[in-house]
């Protein structure tokens, strides 16, 4: 931690910005590294309005899709109306937070699910506008998650899918109650959303509910969600630093994480992992061992 998080990363950041290095770092040679991404386990904000759907960009696609429906146009509803933060369809009781605070005398306030919307964040009118969804065709199901969004859209146009051939119709609050994998299976007519959901699923986050608040995620879940936006980019010159990403993970989830890290490397990235997990160490190209002991008791390489 001292070597990487308190020395290497701040020194690289200072070097890229043309600023003075940290006092204890005498020299650094970035080599081919051009940028640093620190993927730690800190919560994704403290705002309960941030959810898996908003952070991943899925909600933006859904809002535009709902606004394009005839039922929405008849009511004069645009994409902004489907936002639970500011839209006209949000629950008026909780203002779209999905919960209310009870003032308990002599004790801290207690947050409970909103009695009117049941935690869905939306009012009754939102349930009246329903989006047709189709089962994901094999052609889209085989997308590797690396196709660009416009390629997925072009592929969808070539698939014979009549407007009447819908497998389900759901309102926005009902969709946000689904898991990533459940919505992925029904995203055949929304290929751009399917690509985003496929990425989350490949990151081992398919069990997360779309409407789940991001501050409630575990450290490992937060790390992988932060990675979602990086998985489609070329990573030449990028350094990713992970601080003990396997903490709390099941061995199967460690395997998923290893595949994710390998994908970053295949795209040209360099990955540094601060870790004690033997599977992670065994899969590394290089192992730098510091110690014995830690802090002032260690330091030998």
Language-model regions: role of each:
Residues 1-301:
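Conserved phosphate-binding elements of NTP-dependent enzyme cores
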């Amino acid at each position: 931690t001292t070597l990487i998080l308190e020395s290497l990363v701040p020194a690289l950041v200072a070097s890229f910005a043309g600023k003075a290095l940290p006092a204890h770092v005498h020299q650094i040679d970035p080599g081919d590294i051009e940028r640093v991404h620190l993927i730690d386990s800190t919560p994704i904000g403290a705002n309960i309005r941030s959810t898996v759907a908003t952070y991943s960009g899925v909600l933006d696609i859904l809002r535009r899709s709902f606004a394009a429906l005839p039922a929405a146009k008849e009511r004069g509803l645009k994409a902004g109306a489907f936002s639970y933060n500011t839209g006209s369809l949000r629950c008026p009781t909780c203002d779209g937070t999905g919960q209310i605070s009870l003032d308990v005398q002599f004790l801290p306030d207690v947050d409970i699910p909103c009695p009117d919307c049941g935690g869905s964040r939306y009012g009754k009118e939102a349930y009246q506008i329903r989006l047709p969804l189709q089962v994901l065709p094999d052609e889209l199901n085989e997308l590797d998650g690396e196709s660009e969004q416009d390629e997925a859209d072009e592929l969808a146009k070539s698939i014979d899918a009549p407007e009447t051939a819908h497998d389900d119709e759901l309102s926005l609050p009902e969709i946000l109650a689904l898991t990533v994998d459940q919505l992925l299976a029904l995203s055949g007519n929304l290929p751009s959303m399917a690509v985003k959901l496929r990425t989350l699923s490949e990151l081992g986050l398919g069990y997360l509910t779309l409407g789940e608040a991001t501050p409630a995620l575990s450290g490992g879940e937060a790390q992988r969600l932060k990675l979602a936006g990086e998985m489609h980019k070329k990573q030449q010159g990028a350094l990713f630093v992970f601080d003990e990403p396997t903490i709390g993970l099941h061995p199967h989830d460690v395997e998923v994480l290893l595949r994710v890290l390998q994908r970053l490397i295949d795209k040209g990235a360099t990955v540094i992992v601060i870790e004690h997990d033997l599977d992670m160490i065994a899969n590394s190209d290089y192992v730098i061992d510091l110690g014995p002991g830690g802090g002032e008791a260690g330091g030998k390489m």
